[in-house]
Amino acid sequence: MEDKIEDRSGSRHGRRGGAKEPNGVMVKPKGRGTPQGGVISPLLSNIYLHWFETIAGLAAKAMGQAMVIVRYADDFVILAKDWADGFLQKVESILEERMGLTVNREKTKVLDLDAERASLTFLGYEFRKVRDRLYGTGKRYLHFGPSMKSVKRLCREVHGHTHTRNVLLPVETVVERVNRLLEEWGGFYTVGYPSRVFRKVNHYVLKRMARFLNRKSQRYDRLKYADTYYGEMAHYGLYRLAWAKTARRRI
């Protein structure tokens, strides 16, 4: 990094900078590396991965290995139809011996997406091979959509907004908060095949809003504007996830 930054005192200060934990405690780097969440970590990750991608690309070309590296921040995957003998060992050698990094072998794995039930989770998406059932060809194609981890995190946030502790809030306020959450989350998944997951999320959100209205029933009539919860939420403009970008709408 000092080869690229003219003010070396600034780079040294950045490496020594710590990271503040949620409880307010400052964590300082000890020995090698920087604390996760430190201000310099994303910059260092991009610098190292840039050179790794360059060096690994040259090594792959020399070994006749066709591959593509996809990276974001400090995370990356290497995609290939097959592996040349010794290429994976070469990748580890580049990272550890040439670049001085440590490969976390617990988080590093080789996946064969052609294997049954194999899946790759990357940047909130889950990639897996599924069989075609619509046209009856039986062929497998690459399916990708929201990961289960992302869906569970979203549902936890929806649960928090519709929790009993918020029962004194106006329905409009809760709907506005849930809508904002759904719009931001759904906007990230405008590619792929998220329709099945979207339907499940819509059902969960409607169920949570129905329970929220039930808890307020002692304070006013449970359903004011319709005979069903779906109709009631349509009146309040509850957001509904839909696959097509132009079709995502409020109920």
State where each predicted segment sits.
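Non-catalytic terminal/accessory segments
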Residues: M1-I251
